[in-house]
């Protein structure tokens, strides 16, 4: 998504001290699920077009909630597919722990997100988000790492996802609740960057119609 690369690379470049040279490579780690997989799908191509060298890691479990992320961390579970794109060279390491991926690179940015059906439900972020953020801050190897929260998109109007019922199967309501909740969490947890993927998709729907997903909730491969 254009919003991801714009906000993480163009709008929010890594902070450098007077002694540091500009980084040759920008490193982004997503602690997420299939929606983070969609969110980073075209980052490498966008980065190349912008003349930026990029390493992207995605800690992937389909449908993974913040509660499950924290359970994996607290129990040290090697539960993730660690999907990595290193300047166009892709790899996948199954049965990886969050700590292992976290310390694999000196990440410039780490993104977090709630599972899609709960993204607009504030209470589902707690107590897991503060604990997860503290763990990430403690164990990240780059002291200048910056954190971002991924504002995911609402489902298609005709989506059959069971979690759509949380919003009365109303796309507009789901979008509004996600935006409100993500902004509230980002302020409370002092997360400086909100990645507005949901707003980008909703704007696209307003312009081109509700044809943005391949199954009612995951993004279409042609986007």
Predicted regions and their residues:
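Sec/Tat signal peptide C-region and signal peptidase I cleavage site
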Residues: 14-18
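N-terminal module-boundary/linker segments of secreted carbohydrate-active enzymes
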Residues: 19-49
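Residue-level detector of flexible, active-site-proximal loop/helix-junction positions
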Residues: 35, 61-63, 154, 201
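Conserved SGNH/GDSL esterase-like catalytic core that processes O-acyl groups on lipids
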Residues: 37-126
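Bacterial N-terminal signal peptides
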Residues: 2-13
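A structural signal for isolated positions on well-ordered beta-strands in alpha/beta enzyme cores
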Residues: 27-29, 55-57, 146-148
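Alpha-helical cap/lid subdomain in secreted, periplasmic
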Residues: 95-221
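Short, well-ordered coil/turn elements that cap or connect secondary structure elements
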Residues: 23, 49-51, 142, 188-189
């Amino acid at each position: 998504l254009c919003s991801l690369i714009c906000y993480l690379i163009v709008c929010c470049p890594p902070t450098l001290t007077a002694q540091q040279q500009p980084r040759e490579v920008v490193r982004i780690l997503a602690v997420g699920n299939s929606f983070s997989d969609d969110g980073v799908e075209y980052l490498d191509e966008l980065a190349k077009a912008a003349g930026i060298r990029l390493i992207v890691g995605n800690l992937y479990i389909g449908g993974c909630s913040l509660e499950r992320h924290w359970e994996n961390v607290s129990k040290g579970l090697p539960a993730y597919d660690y999907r990595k794109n290193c300047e166009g060279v892709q790899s996948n390491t199954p049965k990886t722990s969050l700590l292992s991926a976290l310390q694999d690179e000196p990440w410039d940015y780490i993104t977090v997100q709630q599972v899609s059906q709960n993204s607009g439900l504030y209470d589902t972020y707690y107590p897991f988000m503060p604990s997860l953020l503290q763990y990430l801050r403690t164990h990240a190897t780059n002291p200048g790492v910056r954190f971002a929260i991924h504002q995911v998109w609402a489902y298609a109007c005709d989506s059959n996802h069971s979690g759509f019922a949380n919003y009365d199967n109303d796309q507009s309501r789901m979008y509004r609740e996600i935006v409100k909740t993500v902004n509230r969490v980002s302020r409370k947890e002092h997360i400086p960057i909100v990645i507005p993927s949901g707003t980008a998709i909703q704007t696209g729907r307003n312009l081109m119609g509700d044809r943005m997903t391949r199954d009612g909730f995951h993004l279409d491969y042609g986007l």
